[in-house]
Amino acid sequence: SKILTETFGIEVVTPRVKVRKAGRSLELDVLAYANSECNAAYIVEIKSHLRPDGIEQLQNILEQFRTFFPEHADKALYGILAVVDAPEDLRQEALSAGIFMAGINDEQFKLEVPKNFQPKAW
């Protein structure tokens, strides 16, 4: 959570969020957001080994987010994949899709994005 608060100005970090609405459910590994001037929300998906369906899963969560959390409709929404191990081609695919990549090593969370990275706001 330190990297989320220091890098993105996040005020609230909530792990393991589960929500049900109209017979549907959504599970988030981490929901982080700020209501202050940054006014953004970040969904963090944690994977030990990134596979192609992991990228698709996060994109689906990002697309459904506002249906389940209308109270955050005014926020810019970003995705972060936090992984222990990711093949370079999948890492590049996620970055090209505008998803932040973070590495997990010894329980440390570190952003791994190139200087020219352009995140996508959903």
Question: Where in the sequence are the language-model features?
Answer:
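Short, charged, amphipathic alpha-helix that recurs within catalytic cores of restriction-modification
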Residues: G54-H72, Y78-D85, D89
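Active-site metal-binding core of divalent-cation-utilizing nuclease and nuclease-like domains
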Residues: F8-E37
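Alpha-helix boundary/capping detector
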Residues: G23, V30, P70, V84, ...
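Short, solvent-exposed coil/turn elements at secondary-structure transition points
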Residues: K18-V19, H49, D85, E107
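Amphipathic, low-proline, heptad-repeat alpha-helices and/or compositionally biased low-complexity charged/polar-rich
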Residues: S1-T7
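Domain-level recognition of nuclease-like catalytic cores that cleave nucleotide substrates
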Residues: L77-W122
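Alpha-helix termination/capping residues and helix-transition junctions
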Residues: C38, A73-D74
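Conserved catalytic cores of phosphodiester-cleaving nucleases, focusing on short active-site segments
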Residues: L28-G54, L58-E63, G79
